[in-house]
Swiss-Prot record:
Residues 76-108 are annotated as: Disordered. Keywords: DNA-binding, Transcription, Transcription regulation. This is T-cell acute lymphocytic leukemia protein 2 homolog. PROSITE patterns: BHLH (PS50888). GO terms for biological process: midbrain development; multicellular organism growth; post-embryonic development; thalamus development. It comes from Mus musculus. SUPFAM superfamilies: HLH, helix-loop-helix DNA-binding domain. Residues 2-54 form the bHLH domain. One of its GO terms (molecular function) is DNA-binding transcription factor activity, RNA polymerase II-specific.
Length: 108
C-alpha cells in the first residue's frame, strides 16, 4: 500500500511538472487573442512553427547585415533588396499575430 501511495505521488508530481512546463511554453508563444488557452498539441505545433519563423528571421537579419557590410565595401551606397516573407511566414503572422522583432529586439 505504501508503494502505491509513493508511486501515485511521484506520478502526480511528474504530471504537475509537465503541466508547468507547458504553461511556461504557452506564455512564450504569441496568440490572438493573447489569453487564448492552447491544448498541449497546439502548444507544441505552434512552438515549432514559431521557432522556425524566428530562426528564419534571425538568419535573414544575419545575411542582411553581412550583405550590407560586403556591398558597402564593394558597391558603395547601394543597399540590398528587401525580400518579401514567404507565404508560410505571412500566414503565421496573420493567423497568430506574431510581432516582427524590431532592430532593438533582444538587445541588452
Amino acid at each position: 500500500m505504501t508503494r502505491k501511495i509513493f508511486t501515485n505521488t511521484r506520478e502526480r508530481w511528474r504530471q504537475q511538472s509537465v503541466n508547468n512546463a507547458f504553461a511556461k511554453l504557452r506564455k512564450l508563444i504569441p496568440t490572438h487573442p493573447p489569453d487564448k488557452k492552447l491544448s498541449k498539441n497546439e502548444t507544441l505545433r505552434l512552438a515549432m512553427r514559431y521557432i522556425n519563423f524566428l530562426v528564419k528571421v534571425l538568419g535573414e537579419q544575419s545575411l542582411h547585415q553581412t550583405g550590407v557590410a560586403a556591398q558597402g565595401n564593394i558597391l558603395g551606397l547601394f543597399p540590398p533588396k528587401t525580400r518579401l516573407p514567404d507565404e508560410d511566414d505571412r500566414t503565421l503572422l496573420n493567423d497568430y499575430r506574431v510581432p516582427s522583432p524590431g532592430p532593438s529586439h533582444g538587445a541588452p
